[in-house]
């Protein structure tokens, strides 16, 4: 769902009134805002001649503050479902994205519910980093009057499963808040747990808070949207609801699939263009494209042969009956393994090597990460039946790719930049599920199921004069191609600076001709390139950032927005450390002050990351 505000000329407020309103509401807590909402409603509905009096206004409702800390959209969707449940139960609720939450108001919360996803190696979702850091700082207040509940979303294929949810739960309790419910840690297949938890939350809150006698108030904290249309005001605009979603994707067509790395490159990167037709599907620079895919039929046949299964065995997936081969092809995950699957398979196969592996957690994590299910079966044979096999495997999930185009230029197309995952295990070639599908199996003009995952935490600045610093090595360059297309079409006068890196200049300079044109035409003000393998010593984008520290600080002082896209585990952490060092050195700050400064940039949406 996308929301666009009407032009200022259509608002029932003058620009001066709108400015005063926006300045005034910034001082109020969510609870106070909820009370004011009811107060103004009462003013509007008074009988003619009646005199409004705050003294006789109804007492402020007890509001449930619901914080969504989402990375890929799942936490946000769950929070929205819970919001609807609470409203249906006549409970006042304030749904807010973690990135928009004024966390210094947390001491005023009485009922707090957090839905938190985890990214990378146990880190909070990008929009929740500032809140997480605040709660773990010395500034966090005691919360003796707060009751809370936490639902954690994660992936058991990662070592630090649901760590962000665990962090929020333990820290809130440490600060003196009381648990309404025990924390829930949910895996990729979280829907059943989520539904049960939603019911428990509603029942618990209904017992704790009486239903409001008037219509429940729902105040949604304003999103600091950076799109020009939405920057003026976030309510009262027109809303366009797309019929397409993760569960109801658009069937589009592949129009272009082109390798954009050289023939001698160690990397296989593809530029993909998808025709959206007349679907009306809309996206913005910074959004991601969700891609549903089928597994490799050869991989399905290999697995069936290893288990001595025919593929025509009847199985049930989400209540739908189908042959086993069809379930393996289109409904079950085959290219990603988890420690939980290894654990269960070890018990079923009684393989001594796998059983011994369970006692060594680091080795188990490494094995699950590097050994797909089919290769585990080959290494530790067993005689699973069809139902046992289906019970072991996780449901297939779509992959998200940062969009590499702006509809201001490409109109009914969407572009993505895909790094194809390729590797060998025991001499057998393997490829990634979605990347292999896009590069090797999907034909041009073939159908592909897609949807848009909106990301309001990675947006161009509203002011076209604002300078932009883009840091995106490898396929992390994708959203910055979209950014530059948008800035060029908008005629944005703000300066643009790109940091890009890859192994070799001659083989791995993605979209080289386009960047050279942007530089020649003055759209791209600066470009700094890091080629890690073109000389004896390795050079990365973080080295270029440090080298340009003084100028980088000048741009920041001029109000530049900083964007980082790419690998979360190493690159993004290294880049952030260099940014801290640059701020400390050129801003004459100590480490703590530099950290606080960068946090302030993040809260002001001047430091945004799209990392994975």
Curated annotation (Swiss-Prot):
GO terms, biological process: cysteine biosynthetic process; hydrogen sulfide biosynthetic process; sulfate assimilation
Function: Component of the sulfite reductase complex that catalyzes the 6-electron reduction of sulfite to sulfide. This is one of several activities required for the biosynthesis of L-cysteine from sulfate. The flavoprotein component catalyzes the electron flow from NADPH -> FAD -> FMN to the hemoprotein component.
PANTHER family: NADPH OXIDOREDUCTASE A, NITRIC OXIDE SYNTHASE-RELATED
Stored PROSITE patterns: FAD_FR, FLAVODOXIN_LIKE
Manner of cofactor binding, per the entry note: Binds 1 FAD per subunit.
Cofactors (names): FAD; FMN
Residues annotated to bind FAD: 335, 369, 399-402, 417-419, 423, 432-435, 612
Pfam families in the record: FAD_binding_1 (PF00667), Flavodoxin_1 (PF00258), NAD_binding_1 (PF00175)
Keyword line: Amino-acid biosynthesis, Cysteine biosynthesis, Electron transport, FAD, Flavoprotein, FMN, NADP, Oxidoreductase, Transport
GO cellular component: cytosol
Pathway assignment: Sulfur metabolism; hydrogen sulfide biosynthesis; hydrogen sulfide from sulfite (NADPH route): step 1/1
Enzyme class: oxidoreductase
Subunit structure and binding partners: Alpha(8)-beta(8). The alpha component is a flavoprotein, the beta component is a hemoprotein.
Source organism: Yersinia pseudotuberculosis serotype O:1b (strain IP 31758)
Binding site for FMN: 70-75, 117-120, 153-162
Record carries keyword Transport: yes
Record protein name field: Sulfite reductase [NADPH] flavoprotein alpha-component
Family: Belongs to the NADPH-dependent sulphite reductase flavoprotein subunit CysJ family.
Lineage: Bacteria, Pseudomonadati, Pseudomonadota, Gammaproteobacteria, Enterobacterales
């Amino acid at each position: 769902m996308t929301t666009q505000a009407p032009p200022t000329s259509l608002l029932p407020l003058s620009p001066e009134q709108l400015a005063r309103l926006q300045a005034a509401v910034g001082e109020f807590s969510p609870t106070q805002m909820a009370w004011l909402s009811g107060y103004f409603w009462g003013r509007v509905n008074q009988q003619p001649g009646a005199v409004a009096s705050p003294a006789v206004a109804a007492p402020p409702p007890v509001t449930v503050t619901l914080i969504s800390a989402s990375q890929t959209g799942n936490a946000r969707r769950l929070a929205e479902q819970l919001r609807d449940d609470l409203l249906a139960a006549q409970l006042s609720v304030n749904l807010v994205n973690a990135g928009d939450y004024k966390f210094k108001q947390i001491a005023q919360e009485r009922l707090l519910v957090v839905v938190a996803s985890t990214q990378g190696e146990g880190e909070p979702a990008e929009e929740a980093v500032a809140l997480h850091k605040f709660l773990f700082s010395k500034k966090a207040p005691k919360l003796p009057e707060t009751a809370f509940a936490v639902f954690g979303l994660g992936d058991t294929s990662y070592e630090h499963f649901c760590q962000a949810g665990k962090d929020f739960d333990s820290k809130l309790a440490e600060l003196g808040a009381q648990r309404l419910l025990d924390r829930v840690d949910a895996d990729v297949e979280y829907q059943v747990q989520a539904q049960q938890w939603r019911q428990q939350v509603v029942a618990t809150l209904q017992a704790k808070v009486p239903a409001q006698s008037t219509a429940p108030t729902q105040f949604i904290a304003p999103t600091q949207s950076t799109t020009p249309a939405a920057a003026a005001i976030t309510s009262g605009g027109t809303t366009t609801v797309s019929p397409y979603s993760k569960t109801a994707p658009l069937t589009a067509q592949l129009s272009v699939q082109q390798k954009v790395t050289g023939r001698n490159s160690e990397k296989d990167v593809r530029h993909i263009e998808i025709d959206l037709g007349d679907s009306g599907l809309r996206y913005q620079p910074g959004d991601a494209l969700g891609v549903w895919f089928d597994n490799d039929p050869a991989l399905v046949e290999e697995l069936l042969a290893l288990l001595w299964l025919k593929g025509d065995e009847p199985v049930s997936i989400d209540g739908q009956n189908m042959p086993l081969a069809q379930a393996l092809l289109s409904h079950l995950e085959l290219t990603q393994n988890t420690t939980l699957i290894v654990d269960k398979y070890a018990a079923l196969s009684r393989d001594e090597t796998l059983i011994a592996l369970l006692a060594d957690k680091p080795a188990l994590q490494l094995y699950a990460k590097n050994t797909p299910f089919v290769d585990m079966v080959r290494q530790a044979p067993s005689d699973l039946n069809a139902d046992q096999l289906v019970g072991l495997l996780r449901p297939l999930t779509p992959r998200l790719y940062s969009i590499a185009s702006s509809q201001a230029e490409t109109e009914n197309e969407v572009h993505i930049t895909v790094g194809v995952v390729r590797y060998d295990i025991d001499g057998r070639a393997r490829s990634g599920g979605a990347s292999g599908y896009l590069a090797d199996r999907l034909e041009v003009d073939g159908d592909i199921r897609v949807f848009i995952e909106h990301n309001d935490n990675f947006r161009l600045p509203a002011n076209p004069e604002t300078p932009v610093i883009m840091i995106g090595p490898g396929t992390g360059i994708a959203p910055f191609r979209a950014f530059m297309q948008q800035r060029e079409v908008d005629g944005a006068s703000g300066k643009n600076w790109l940091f890009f890196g890859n192994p070799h200049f001659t083989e791995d300079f993605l979209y080289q001709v386009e960047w050279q044109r942007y530089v020649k035409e003055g759209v791209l003000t600066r470009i700094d390139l890091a080629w890690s393998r073109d000389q004896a010593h390795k050079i990365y984008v973080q080295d270029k950032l440090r080298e340009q520290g003084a100028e980088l600080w000048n741009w920041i002082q001029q109000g530049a927005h900083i964007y980082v896209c790419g690998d979360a585990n190493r690159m993004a952490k290294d880049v952030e450390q260099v940014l801290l060092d640059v701020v400390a050195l050129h801003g004459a700050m100590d480490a703590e002050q530099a950290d606080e400064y960068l946090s302030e940039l993040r809260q002001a949406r001047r430091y945004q990351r799209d990392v994975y």
